Amino acid sequence: MSKEKRLIEKEDLIPANIYSESRKQIRKDLVEFKKNRRIALGPYATFYFESFETMVAQVQEMLHIEKGGDEQLKDELIAYNPLVPNGKELVATLMFEIDNPISRGAFLGKVGGIEEKIFMKVDNEEVKALPEADVDRTSEEGKASSVQFIHFKLNDDQINKFKSDNINIELGIDHKEYSHATKLTEANIKSLLADFI
């Protein structure tokens, strides 16, 4: 198993036929696992904190849907391995979820550059989010992407604080058109602790 290496390899996946038979239960278990890793922020933004487990599930599901075998697997590993937390960071998929396409387009047109305004506070010490490299975030026209991949890189002191009892962790966005913050619950923090070495 490659969890300790923080890298998904072919050996971490179950065979396609077994996945297909077990898929319903696997997905049900994943929903439960992800429950405390989902954090809503304001009316439209939701952070889904990724992990080795969520990325294995994503690769497995893509292979199940597209049935591309080993050739596809190479591409999926290139795409999803950078989103496996490396032991000193938290990684999240941030989604702006607005059902109406016209409203969504108008909102995203107002929040260009929002990926530069995301932060986490660990005991009032701010950690700026780093957008995933080589992924489109804000277009040349200033329109934000509805899906953002972000990293929060923490130093050893911040990680130790994260692990301490009664720690105050805050997640926020400070954009002039979308400014919201929320405190992480004890259940959120406990789930995210597994991402650190």
Residue ranges and their predicted role:
Residues S2-T46, E50-E89, E97-I197:
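Long, contiguous binding/interaction regions
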